[in-house]
Design a protein with these regions (language model features):
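Topology signature of small-to-medium multi-pass alpha-helical membrane proteins
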Residues: 1-136
Length: 136
């Protein structure tokens, strides 16, 4: 079966979001690693833990993309939607708690959030529901 337009758009938006997050992570890596909370985590779990967590997170995002867009997994579709909602809540919470943030990382986070929003919307359009074998 040819992938529907919504699934192709999902791939563009979702992978774009992952790319923006990768750039944002690379740009803020040094600052994040010297953060007092990160230093405490490194002391408790080891200096390798932030890097391992980052690799795990990006791997999970790419696996979910593969299973949703290529393997037609309805579970992956819902996992992406649930993680999106949790990420949105975390983003809003971080804005209210952490105070002023640098403009470029904040801007990249907003762009990533917009791309992820568009990707999740694409997963629940009528042609995408048919792709996953769900009723529209």
């Amino acid at each position: 079966m040819v992938r529907p337009k919504s699934i192709r758009l999902f791939e563009l938006f979702y992978l774009g979001s992952v790319l923006v997050e990768a750039v944002n992570t690379a740009m803020t890596w040094a600052e994040t690693n010297t953060n007092p909370q990160t230093m405490q985590v490194k002391q408790m779990l080891g200096p390798w833990f932030p890097a391992l967590l980052t690799v795990f997170t990006f791997s999970l995002w790419l696996l979910l993309w593969y299973f949703a867009a290529r393997a037609r997994s309805n579970i992956a579709r819902w996992a992406i939607a649930i993680l999106y909602v949790l990420g949105l809540i975390g983003f809003v919470f971080s804005l209210t708690v952490s105070g002023p943030q640098s403009a470029i990382p904040l801007g990249l986070s907003v762009v990533s959030l917009i791309l992820t929003t568009l990707a999740v919307v694409c997963l629940f359009r009528r042609d995408a529901s048919a792709w996953f074998g769900a009723s529209a």
